[in-house]
Amino acid sequence: KLATDAIAALPGAGRVTVNVTQKITAHAVQRGVKLVPGVKNIVAVASGKGGVGKSTTAVNLALALAAEGAKVGILDADIYGPSQPTMLGISGRPESVDGKTIEPMEAYGIQAMSIGFLIDVDTPMVWRGPMVTQALEQLLKDTRWRDLDYLIVDMPPGTGDIQLTLSQKVPVTGAVIVTTPQDIALIDARKGLKMFEKVGVPIVGIVENMSIHVCSKCGHAEHIFGTGGAETMCKDYDVPFLGSLPLDIRIREQADSGRPTVVADPDGKVAEMYREIARKTAVAVARKAEDFSAKFPSIVIQNT
């Protein structure tokens, strides 16, 4: 719109039509890890501790990227506590056409996969670490993702087996860290950031959730968890600050009802915040080195 208005204002300009196209390419990942078929870029959404709104941020980030025109999927990597089926309002079981792969579920224009689609809601996952990591690999690689620009991975909190598996065996383009301004959350967020750095996964940026609370009755605004913590962390580690989100009861209500904020209130202020975070995430990914591994032929050396 800005480009159209600027050109139309020039003397002698008639009717102006501006067509904008985009091309999203695959970007470099950890050494020795191959790309997943049908997926160009994998972005992990992680947090150092639970309860900071990571899953809500992940699903709204995925939906916001889709709203910007990208082809997006979301993988629920929280094997012990999957929440994406509820947040996306999806029920039922995924299908398998060939008996080897499974078709992703779909909602609001994005593809989705979760262990929650394969078990009953009340069934606990009493699994040890190796079984959990194997399940994650199968969910990722046995799902027939269809030409995704971005696959958002909703990580479990902490720095355990799943995080290690993801960083060693899954081609991650970058990680988004979600935290609150609270000192305890920031301490754990720093640990998560350092873990990704140690295993060679670049940090796309940090999102500060619950940064401010606005009373739904009187409109009073208050920083109940502190202020400025995530921005300070970004400066300390020289990583981008992607944005802040409010502590708003509607975000929780919309996610619980199976209609996350970006689709429940697309013209609202909070939805625009999510879209701005999505745009910054896309820009940060685009600035990373492209992956050219598929463009080169395989070289085989044989002794004859």
Segments the model singles out, each with a brief description of its role:
Residues 1-17:
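Short, non-transmembrane amphipathic alpha-helical segments
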Residues 34-40:
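Phosphate-binding P-loop
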Residues 65-127, 133-141:
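Phosphate-binding loop that captures ATP/GTP phosphates
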Residues 7, 39, 50, 76, ...:
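Residue-level signature of catalytic and energy-coupling elements of molecular machines
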Residues 33-34, 149-150, 156-257:
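Conserved catalytic-core segment of NTP-binding enzymes
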Residues 277-280, 290-304:
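A short, charged, Gly/Pro-tolerant segment at domain boundaries
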